[in-house]
Amino acid sequence: LSDEKGKVEALIRKGAKLVANSDAKNDFQSMGFDVEDLEKSYEENQVIIDCTPSGNKNWGEIYSNLDKDKRFLAQGSEHGFGPFFAWGINNNVLANDQNKYLIASCNTHNIASILKTFVLDTDKNLNEGRFVCLRRANDVSQNDSFSPSPTITKHDNQEFGTHHARDVFELFKQEGKKLNLFSSAIKLPTQYMHTLWFNLSFEKNTELKEVLNSLENSEFLMSTEKLSSNKVFSFGRDHGYHGRLLSHGIIAKDSLHVKENNLTGYC
């Protein structure tokens, strides 16, 4: 805990208030922090963003007992918390009479944006979309959970393979669109970014020129001539907002391949 003290101090300098439950409060106070009660903050704030892997548990034990006019947001792992929300994909869902939302994960945003750009925005009919998520082992800020060799994720969903395709299917199903999707995933020994392989099979033939034009017009997908994730990561670190790339995905232009009605590429 003490080695993250500087991170908390930086947030407080930017205007954040530190709140904690009774178990953690004494630890923070022993390091010199002013700490307010977590329970009090539940009452004072109108929007509660839960970034923990306990969103569903916290809803059942805490949030469901609070004022129903508050808004509750949970992270992508908490499937079933509420309807999916992906920025730029289904913003209209925020107008619904709903007080809790599930913020789609980075991979869900990535796949959804690819489908929006190359299928939905072009009024194409999709026969099938197949995706392989090449996932990083852990974040650059983490020491544990590193995988020293490629580790395969089980296909535990008969219809969709892994949860990645299922989540995107459910996201678009909320809009009345049912897409034929399948995903696989493998964890690689890297701390850089996730990489996504995709193959879209359309009802009719397409051309690379048309695909590149769709990519150029996309608001949330960017493109790059770089072919290594470390180069893309380095660019984001040097030039992105707080070192971040906030696009849904960065398409490697030279990876795009069109053969008749099939588009293949990496993001």
Model-based region annotation:
Residues 1-141:
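N-terminal Rossmann-like NAD(P) cofactor-binding subdomain of oxidoreductases
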Residues 1-36, 125-267:
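C-terminal substrate-binding/catalytic lobe of Rossmann-fold NAD(P)-dependent oxidoreductases
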